[in-house]
Amino acid sequence: MEKFTKLTGIAAPMPLVNIDTDMIIPKQFLKTIKRSGLGVNLFDEMRYDRQGNENPDFVLNKPQYRDAQILVTGENFGCGSSREHAPWALLDFGIRCVIAPSFADIFYNNCFKNGILPIALPQEEVDKLMDDAARGANATVTVDLENQTISGPDGGTISFEVDAFKKHCLLNGLDDIGLSLEKVASIDAFEAQASAARPWV
């Protein structure tokens, strides 16, 4: 998993509430177990019309937001079914950070396991960042995980909270497999001890 330390990039404003995982990546695209290739179908039903043409009014289709790495959105983001394809699609598109007033719990935890930083902020601070994001490519936002700060184009800084263990995992690029590999020596020692104590098992 790619480390997340400091990210400076374009923030895309999506002022919608209750964006569920089916809106993030519709069910017809869940047939794969690969993490790559899902970005093209991110927000599929909002990005494209029935003929498959891009909707020019959708934020991520606008030229100034096509390379967005940060998404600023409304409360309860990621609600609905617990599909891990949702963070996979965001990451494959290029989104490394999602900022919202609140998140669905399972989606929130899945983000950390896939290299995405979800940040929950008070509504007024999200509104400020939404206004900043409306400036498009002329306004970059910096998210500093180590110092737990967000810096806007006007130089203002917002602090955010994050669980210490989840922060450690993102800073070091550790997913569940990476965490297990860190403990290989301890696991081997335990298995050897258990085998010696109970050779009949």
From Swiss-Prot:
Pathways per UniProt: Amino-acid biosynthesis; L-leucine biosynthesis; L-leucine from 3-methyl-2-oxobutanoate: step 2/4
Enzyme class, UniProt record, top EC level: lyase
Subunit structure: Heterodimer of LeuC and LeuD.
Record function comment: Catalyzes the isomerization between 2-isopropylmalate and 3-isopropylmalate, via the formation of 2-isopropylmaleate.
Record's keyword terms, sorted: Amino-acid biosynthesis, Branched-chain amino acid biosynthesis, Leucine biosynthesis, Lyase
Catalytic activity annotation: (2R,3S)-3-isopropylmalate = (2S)-2-isopropylmalate
E.C. number(s) listed in UniProt: 4.2.1.33
Similarity annotation: Belongs to the LeuD family. LeuD type 1 subfamily.
InterPro entries, A to Z: 3-IsopropMal_deHydase_ssu, Aconitase/3IPM_dehydase_swvl, AconitaseA/IPMdHydase_ssu_swvl, IPMI_Swivel, LeuD
Pfam families (UniProt xref): Aconitase_C
GO molecular function annotation: 3-isopropylmalate dehydratase activity
HAMAP family: LeuD_type1 (MF_01031)
A GO cellular component entry from the record: 3-isopropylmalate dehydratase complex
Coiled coil segments of this chain: none
Source organism superkingdom: Bacteria
Official protein name in the record: 3-isopropylmalate dehydratase small subunit
Organism: Dinoroseobacter shibae (strain DSM 16493 / NCIMB 14021 / DFL 12)
